[in-house]
Amino acid sequence: MSDPIKVDIWSDVQCPWCYIGKRKFEAGAAQFGGDVEVEYHSYELAPDTPVDFEGTPLDYLAQHKGISLEQAEQMTQTVTGIAASVGLDYHYEHIHQTNTVKAHELIHYAKAKGRQLDMKERLLKAYFVDGRHVGRIEDLADLAAEIGFDRADVVRSLEANEYLADVKADVAQATEYGIQGVPFFVIDGKYGVSGAQEADTFANVLAQVRDEKAAAQ
């Protein structure tokens, strides 16, 4: 039995393409059919954003990208349509724009307990689908408790910045790799795939890596 193929994914909780890319990658991995080991890494698209951003996601987009509110609305409508095509029901009207550093710390907390993928999925769904706040410690603790974590221990960890160094290390590694946007997939430590590519693309790269590994044995 061959070892699983390692896939490292840089991603942000409030990146709409990261959730879409997650679904497309999952479809590609299923299509590939072999063993794949996924690890998520922190990437902050807007580290200067306050925890409680005053304004709507459209206000944020317009400010951040230097575009009009009409253009921002068009962008969100486009991405909502693409999300729907992979089974995701985005609700931009309910989104709480925030700072995601604590959400990233929580993902590392979950990783230490062997449940990183569950926590990542819950946070993405909370942000884009459920209209939950993913920047405040109390809200994050609620979300963690919903999937079985000890709420008080999550609060303790986040208040102590227990995994902040891990978040910073991920961000530093992204810079070292030259990653300038997410999602970004590093497959088998050597192939980089940028953006929410189609499932076929992921399946093909995974198959290529499997064949290369087999040929090298």
Language model features with spans:
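C-terminal cap of thioredoxin/glutaredoxin-like
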Residues: 2-36, 40, 107-217
